[in-house]
């Protein structure tokens, strides 16, 4: 039964990727927007894993297959497939998609038994990063150099606000800590992850942010107790 589930998930991802590739070729949507659709879609897929699979080994195998596919897309000549354009833009070369799959795989191995500890890092990565990137791409006026690249104040503020909203709601529903503590913990986590996102480079925020959130929760286990 697990093998059937694996084939279904793999087929769904391939169809999703082919659809995005078609949209990219049609030039109806901005390349960055398409990348973030892939980002959010991958995150949603990752969030469903604890509800689909019973064995950790199934997701490990699936994750390895995804990594091989993504690496292969980058190796094969882009003129032949055109798939690489879905993963990166002309002005931004990144390995973020590979790091994203690695994050899902890593979080699955260490926290799949605790759905809150597994889900919160992924949701922050999925939504905060995507919204920040889109705001930074289309609406930014104030940019700054981090030493690793260029970021925007608007994008960083968006990352902070989105993370804060996510944390507030998660701790409200999945924790017994008091309201004041929820506000303070959410504020602290939002500030720290925003800083981490700012100083990350080449898509490494897709690794740094979720694992930092996981370690934060692991060191403060009472935050996930209800």
Tell me the role of every PLM-derived stretch:
Residues 67-69:
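A short structural micro-motif
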Residues 13-16:
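Glycine/aspartate-rich loop-and-adjacent alpha/beta segment that forms the canonical ThDP
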Residues 3-4, 18-59, 71-166, 173, ...:
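Interhelical loop and helix-boundary elements at the membrane-water interface
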Residues 63-64:
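Eukaryotic helix-linker segments that join adjacent hydrophobic helices
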Residues 1-11:
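Hydrophobic transmembrane alpha-helical segments in integral membrane proteins
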Residues 173-180, 226:
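Alpha-helical transmembrane bundle and helix-membrane interface signal
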């Amino acid at each position: 039964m697990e093998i059937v589930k694996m084939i279904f998930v793999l087929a769904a991802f391939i169809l999703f990727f082919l659809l995005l590739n078609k949209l990219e070729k049609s030039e109806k949507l901005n390349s960055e927007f398409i990348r973030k659709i892939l980002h959010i879609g991958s995150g949603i897929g990752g969030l469903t894993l604890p509800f689909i699979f019973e064995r950790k080994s199934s997701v490990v195998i699936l994750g390895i297959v995804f990594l091989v596919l993504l690496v292969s897309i980058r190796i094969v000549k882009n003129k032949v497939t055109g798939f690489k354009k879905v993963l990166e833009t002309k002005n931004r070369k990144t390995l973020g998609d590979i790091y994203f799959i690695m994050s899902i795989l890593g979080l699955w191995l260490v926290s799949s038994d605790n759905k809150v500890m597994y889900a919160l890092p992924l949701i922050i990565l999925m939504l905060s990063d995507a919204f920040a990137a889109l705001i930074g791409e289309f609406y930014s006026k104030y940019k700054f150099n981090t030493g690793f690249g260029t970021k925007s104040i608007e994008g960083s503020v968006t990352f902070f606000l989105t993370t804060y909203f996510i944390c507030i709601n998660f701790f409200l529903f999945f924790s017994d800590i008091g309201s004041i503590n929820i506000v303070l913990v959410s504020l602290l986590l939002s500030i720290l992850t925003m800083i981490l996102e700012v100083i990350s480079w080449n898509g490494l925020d897709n690794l740094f942010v979720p694992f930092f959130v996981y370690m934060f929760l692991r060191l403060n286990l009472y935050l996930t107790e209800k």
